[in-house]
């Protein structure tokens, strides 16, 4: 393979990464979120969502309604939680939400921060679920939970780039 072919492959790879990054940033701006896509990591929302489903989020709604499926983050915890709004209270300044997983027996009070009885929509909510793709996100779960799968996948990608003819 000559230098021109190698440069062409490198530029094509750069184009793919730049396009993916621009698509991600466009989705972020349109949805008003830093992360407009999340993967379901547990079975707490079954049967609505299964582990490995990809969820598309939106954060341009003024208020949440009872029954909306929301994604929220708790201070001190790194993993976002996907649950349904069970109860809501609001006044002119803020909206407070109580959530619960469809497959859970009790509400999420035990998941919230200490001395927190409700989620504050402005501070805790990441977004509202507007759509999903079933099971496509399962690859990310396999990569994060299985070290051998991660290294095997990286090895295959490396080998394919070494032996490609284009």
Swiss-Prot record:
Its main location: endoplasmic reticulum. The active site is at residues 44, 83, 108. InterPro entries: LexA/Signal_pep-like_sf, Pept_S26A_signal_pept_1_Ser-AS, Peptidase_S24_S26A/B/C, Peptidase_S26, Peptidase_S26B. The chain crosses the membrane at residues 10-30. Residues 152-163 are annotated as: C-terminal short (CTS) helix. Residues 31-166 are lumenal. Its EC number is 3.4.21.89. Keywords: Endoplasmic reticulum, Hydrolase, Membrane, Protease, Signal-anchor, Transmembrane, Transmembrane helix. It catalyses: Cleavage of hydrophobic, N-terminal signal or leader sequences from secreted and periplasmic proteins. Pfam families: Peptidase_S24. GO terms for biological process: signal peptide processing. One of its GO terms (cellular component) is signal peptidase complex. Belongs to the peptidase S26B family. Component of the signal peptidase complex (SPC) composed of a catalytic subunit SEC11 and three accessory subunits SPC1, SPC2 and SPC3. The complex induces a local thinning of the ER membrane which is used to measure the length of the signal peptide (SP) h-region of protein substrates. This ensures the selectivity of the complex towards h-regions shorter than 18-20 amino acids. SPC associates with the translocon complex. This is Signal peptidase complex catalytic subunit SEC11. It comes from Lodderomyces elongisporus (strain ATCC 11503 / CBS 2605 / JCM 1781 / NBRC 1676 / NRRL YB-4239) (Yeast).
């Amino acid at each position: 393979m000559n230098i021109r072919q190698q440069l062409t492959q490198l530029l094509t790879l750069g184009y793919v990464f730049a396009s993916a990054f621009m698509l991600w940033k466009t989705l972020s701006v349109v949805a008003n979120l830093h992360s407009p896509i999340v993967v379901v990591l547990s079975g707490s929302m079954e049967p609505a969502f299964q582990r490995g489903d990809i969820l598309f989020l939106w954060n341009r709604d003024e208020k949440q309604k009872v029954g909306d499926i929301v994604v929220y983050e708790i201070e001190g915890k790194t993993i976002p939680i996907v649950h349904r709004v069970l109860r809501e209270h609001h006044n002119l300044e803020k909206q407070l939400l109580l959530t619960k997983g469809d497959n859970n027996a009790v509400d999420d009070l035990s998941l919230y921060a200490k001395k927190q009885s409700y989620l504050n929509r402005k501070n805790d909510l990441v977004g509202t679920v507007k759509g999903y793709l079933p099971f496509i996100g399962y690859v990310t779960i396999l990569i994060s939970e299985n070290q051998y799968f991660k290294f095997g996948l990286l090895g295959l990608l490396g080998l394919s780039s070494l032996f490609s003819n284009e």
